[in-house]
From Swiss-Prot:
ATP binds at residue 662. Its EC number is 6.1.1.9. This is Valine--tRNA ligase, mitochondrial. It is an enzyme of class 6 (ligase). One of its GO terms (biological process) is valyl-tRNA aminoacylation. The gene is Vars2. Keywords: Acetylation, Aminoacyl-tRNA synthetase, ATP-binding, Ligase, Mitochondrion, Nucleotide-binding, Protein biosynthesis, Transit peptide. It comes from Mus musculus (Mouse). Catalyzes the attachment of valine to tRNA(Val) in a two-step reaction: valine is first activated by ATP to form Val-AMP and then transferred to the acceptor end of tRNA(Val).
Length: 1060
């Protein structure tokens, strides 16, 4: 080994022997190290590949290293499942006296903790008020009540992950937190499910039972099946106050619904009228806008619909002639996608300025089916450049036509009945036929009469009932409506004035537009399951006309009777009242949830302390249907906004960018990700669903492609962390299982890190308070500074509700700062004799603070590991990590050393460069010496304190300095680092040029071929990615040429060395 000319070796920082003499302890990971014991060729090649990948990362810049990978860095292999088998009663604290299992296992980690948290009352605001770190501030929030019928899908899991992270952070920082759990009775969905069950088990239809018997069956089903969703919430770690759980059909909620209806009616904001409503013929009920799925059709599309005997074609435009009365050779051709509504036509409309029809203004047309006279009317809403410029007017079955009919005084004709068949107004030849069967019969008749003018493909949007799959009809029905204009104006002004904050702010535009065009809200539903409308019809009062019926509203029949007596002037005893059999829209009770869940209309302590809510967090798809209605009714009924801040997260989509939907078969069940699931079971779930054969085949193929070996067990913590790691406040969220799996690997990394820390601390370790922990080396100071910085960034992320900043910060600290750097650097220090006292205290601080930072996002893993840390003198900070103080910026600011971090960033660049050199020359075992030549004395001063850890982290031997201007040592490889530093690494005696040169040549030929292929491609093929890859190949080729030059130099010098 040649002498190092003008080299100055830095003595070891911790009083140890030089790093080239150290025996390296076993690494934390389970794979053998490249410089350890002999390894197989396969393992060695795998290690070299990883080193090359790290070299590429260096070339892309160190900033890339801090990014959280979007895909796993390790292939999945089945892991051994470890179970927690120590007998522990429900609610008892988990036994953590034994050693940690060798590897992370989600089932072991997640066992027993949740029941203990609940029993101890950690989730109750009364407990939090007694915490030492109590701030006296209140944080209240409610969960968007999921439908009691179903199970949580991945969209629900996203909501829970976000809300629970925020709730746990507020609780740990000392706020008095109330997170209200609840579930929605889901009128249509629940009734449909129970009807299916009754038919399947008893062959009984709903109408064969009395209303009381059917509701009894629904409640029985709810008690038996409805708890599944609560079990899922617990499995996700949702820290809800279960003592305050509410159901939208329980006694308290029912009283609130009745009170709200009565107050709105008495205020003139609720009325009954005959208007067009969204109607599901299969359900025989009005449905809400959110239950109408707008399905775009590019052209002719064949659908099989419930209740229809044959498939139906949509996306076709039929042209029909309307003869002009008195002019046998003159006709107006009208295009329609709904020929079945022709019997309901009462006019044809054209634009008043359309020159094609000016001469026909005021004329009469003959109905093509009945021959009746119809007026030709003019209306400015008609678009003259669309089709023929003439439209048929069917006020009873089209919202647009209803407006035209109202303006022109046209009488609507209802030709489609509640069950989707044709009414008696159509004549005997159509009455009772399914509307889509009648469609074909009508077109055949038009052909026979010579009035059919053709059929062509036509793109359209088809309204589909999301509950039944049937086409939505617009029917005229007598229903109850809420006047929304006045309340909507107040909701719009609340956002405009800043009293109500929507985040992200770009939702404000949609909010203002929706409320500027809001119509009245139909709240009647023709169901049995739900809140029966507290309205009563007075029998005998104008009963011959439903538009003039006498209706009264009351909290009870007695109250309604008193109102009826006053209105009619008749004695109460003489009145006969009949209660409206309809129920209220589920969204009506949901809109009351923020205050009904707290006891409204009663003046309860919870209502006084926690209302208005601090924050409303939900999916952006519910902004209008739920959030908007909560704001309207909350302001109207309580005199206050129900919340002042709304946080709207993105929609979850699959890897192809499609919305996750049961109708597409691409929904991810959180339980499958948490516990793992075999492909056969996943495919069976698809077959058991309601997909048609074509959709089933597509969904099954996609599922098999995405999960050829099923879904691996990832655990709750990994799923929560993955969901929160996305920028949830912007565009759609594209989640893949591979991302979640990557975070399971991250959990395993944390697990192994804490096993190392616990071994390093030993049995007699006594932690010092954070303010007394003094770094004994630059590395100690650096990791503590990074820890304080992580705490500051996490606090900033939680305050701004940007959870992706929190996850990014924690991932980077634990993986890249603590595990990859500090633990590797400190291992030789911990094995030294005598062992300095500083590093163990630093390790404890990193584990304690790091786990508390992590706890809101990974509550199970954080609790499991934190409970095993050595106890502090005088007892632990808290009985559970979920009520321990959350580290704040102020509490750790004494550790911050930004200048030191900047210095070490340069050291890390040197480490990366050295690792890249080792990979190039395949120095898997040897520890070459290193010389650094700095042209700037200041830079040498930055690096000098870290020479010892630099050698350890780069797996090199002694590290020293070469004086500026000194000649390069012979037999050493050179790589520049910017313009101010040259790095020399010893090659003489460590590399065999004769074996390495052919390898480099082969590698160069392979890369050159890749480069030639890229250069020969057309410029249009992924230009940006192509240019980036070309630049990377040029750089790698240049480095290979340089390496080959050094190896050739070694070969040339070999003979003279032998002669000596």
């Amino acid at each position: 080994m040649p002498h190092l000319p003008l080299a100055s070796f830095r003595p070891p920082l911790w009083g140890l022997r030089p790093s080239w003499g150290l025996s390296r302890p076993q690494a934390l990971c389970t794979q053998p190290e490249p410089h350890g014991s002999p390894v197989s060729r396969r393992n060695r090649e795998a290690k070299q590949k990883r080193l090359r990948e790290k070299q590429a990362a260096l070339e892309a810049g160190l900033a890339e290293k801090s990014k959280i990978p979007a895909v796993p860095t390790k292939a999945w292999s089945h892991k051994e499942v470890v179970l927690y088998e120590i007998p522990t009663g429900p609610g008892e604290k988990k036994d953590v006296s034994g050693p940690l299992p060798p590897a992370y296992s989600p089932q072991y980690v997640e066992a027993a903790w949740y029941q203990w948290w609940v029993r101890e009352g950690f989730f109750k605001p009364e407990y939090q008020a007694r915490l030492p770190q109590a701030t006296g501030e209140t944080f209240s929030m409610c969960i968007p009540p999921p439908n009691v019928t179903g199970s949580l899908h991945i969209g629900h899991a996203l909501t829970v992950a976000i809300q629970d992270a925020l709730v746990r952070w507020h609780r740990m920082r000392g706020d008095r937190v109330l997170w209200i759990p609840g579930s929605d009775h889901a009128g249509i969905a629940t009734q449909a499910m129970v009807e299916k069950q009754l038919w399947k088990e008893q062959r009984v239809r709903r109408h064969e039972l009395s209303r009381e018997d059917f509701l009894r069956a629904v409640w029985q089903w709810k008690h038996e099946k409805g708890g599944e969703i609560y079990e899922q919430l617990c499995a996700l770690g949702a820290s809800l106050d279960w003592d305050r759980e509410c159901f939208t059909m329980d006694a308290g909620s029912s009283a609130a619904v009745t009170e709200a209806f009565v107050r709105l009616y008495n205020s003139g904001l609720l009325y009954r009228n005959r208007q067009l409503v969204n109607w599901s013929c299969t359900l025989r009920s009005a449905i809400s806008d959110i239950e109408v799925e707008s399905r775009p059709l590019p052209g002719r599309t064949v659908l099989q619909l419930p209740g229809c005997p044959t498939p139906v074609s949509f996306g076709l435009l039929a042209s029909v002639a309307f003869p002009v009365d008195g002019e046998p050779d003159t006709e107006i051709v009208v295009g329609t996608t709904r020929p079945e509504t022709l019997p309901g036509d009462v006019a044809v409309a054209v634009h008043p300025d359309d020159p094609r029809y000016t001469h026909l203004h005021g004329r009469q047309l003959r109905h093509p089916l009945t021959g009746q006279l119809l007026p030709l009317i003019t209306d400015t809403t008609v678009q003259p450049h669309v089709g023929t410029g003439a439209v048929k007017v069917t006020p009873a079955h089209s919202p647009i036509d209803a407006e035209i009919g109202t303006r022109h005084g046209l009488t609507p004709l209802s030709v489609i009945a509640e069950d989707g068949t044709m009414t008696s107004l159509c004549g005997d030849w159509l009455q009772g036929l399914h509307r889509f069967v009648a469609r074909e019969k009508i077109m055949c008749t038009l052909r026979e009469q010579g009035l059919f003018r053709g059929l062509q493909e036509h793109p359209m949007v088809l309204p589909i009932c999301s509950r039944s799959g049937d086409v939505v009809e617009y029917l005229l029905k007598s229903q109850w409506f809420v006047r929304c204009q006045e309340m909507g104006d107040l909701a719009a002004k609340a956002v405009e004035s800043g009293a109500l904050e929507l985040w992200p702010s770009f939702h404000q535009k949609s909010w203002q537009h929706w409320f500027a065009h809001i119509g009245d809200w139909c709240v009647s539903r023709q169901l049995w399951w739900g809140h029966q409308i507290p309205a009563y019809r007075v029998i005998g009062e104008n009963a011959e006309d439903d538009r003039k019926e006498c209706w009264v509203v009351g909290r009870s029949e007695a109250e309604a009777r008193a109102v009826a007596a006053k209105r009619t002037g008749r004695p109460e005893a003489e009145l006969t009242l009949e209660r409206d059999p309809d129920v209220l829209d589920t969204w009506f009770s949901s809109a009351l949830f923020p205050f009904s869940a707290l006891g409204w209309p009663r003046e309860t302590p919870d209502l006084a302390h926690f209302y208005p809510l601090t924050l409303l967090e939900t999916g952006s798809d519910l902004l209008m249907f739920w959030v908007g209605r909560m704001v309207m009714l909350g302001t109207q009924l309580t005199g206050q906004l129900p919340f002042s801040k709304v946080l709207l997260h993105s929609m979850v989509r699959d890897r192809q960018g499609r919305k996750m939907s049961k109708s597409l078969g691409n929904v991810l069940d959180p339980r499958d990700i948490i516990s793992g699931q075999e492909l056969q079971v996943l495919q069976a779930k698809l077959r058991d669903g309601n997909l048609d054969p074509g959709e089933l085949a597509v969904a099954a193929a996609a599922q098999k492609k995405d999960f050829p070996y099923g879904i691996p067990e990832c655990g709750t913590d990994a799923l929560r962390f993955a969901l929160c790691s996305h920028g949830i406040l912007g565009g759609d969220l594209h989640l893949s299982v591979s991302e979640v799996l990557n975070y399971r690997h991250f959990c395993n990394k944390l697990w192994n890190a804490l096993r190392f820390v616990l071994r390093a601390l030993g049995d007699n370790f006594v932690p010092q308070p954070a303010e007394e922990v003094t770094p004994s080396s630059p590395m100690d100071a650096w990791i503590l500074s990074r820890l304080a910085f992580a705490a500051s960034e996490c606090e900033r992320g939680f305050l701004s509700r940007e959870l992706s900043l929190v996850t990014h910060t924690l991932y980077h600290f634990w993986l890249h700062n603590l595990c990859d750097v500090y633990l590797e650097a400190v291992k030789p220090v911990l094995s030294s004799v005598p062992r300095p006292p500083g590093p163990p205290q630093v390790l404890f601080s990193c584990a304690d603070v790091g786990l508390r930072l992590l706890a809101p996002l990974m509550p199970f893993l954080a609790e499991e590991l934190w409970q095993r840390l050595p106890p502090r003198p005088g007892g632990p900070l808290a009985p559970s990590i979920c009520v321990a103080p959350y580290p704040s910026t102020r509490s750790l600011e004494f550790w911050r050393q930004p200048e030191l971090e900047r210095c070490f960033s340069r050291v890390q660049e040197v480490v990366q460069a050295l690792r890249a050199l080792r990979a190039t020359y395949q120095l898997t075992k040897a520890r070459p010496q290193v010389l650094l030549q700095c042209s700037d004395p200041g830079e040498q001063g930055l690096v000098q304190p870290f020479l010892e850890p630099l050698g350890i982290l780069s797996h090199c031997g002694a590290v020293g300095f070469l004086s500026p201007g000194a000649a390069a040592p012979s037999g050493w490889a050179l790589t520049p680092l910017g313009d101010t530093m040259k790095i020399y690494m010893e090659l003489q005696g460590l590399v065999d040029p004769q074996s390495q040169l052919p390898r480099l040549t082969a590698r160069r030929q392979k890369l050159q071929k890749q480069l030639d292929d890229l250069l020969n491609r057309t410029m249009s093929e992924g230009l940006a990615e192509r240019q980036q890859r070309i630049s990377s190949l040029h750089l790698e080729l240049s480095k290979l040429d340089q390496a080959a030059s050094y190896l050739q130099q070694l070969m040339d010098e070999a003979p003279s060395a032998r002669e000596l």
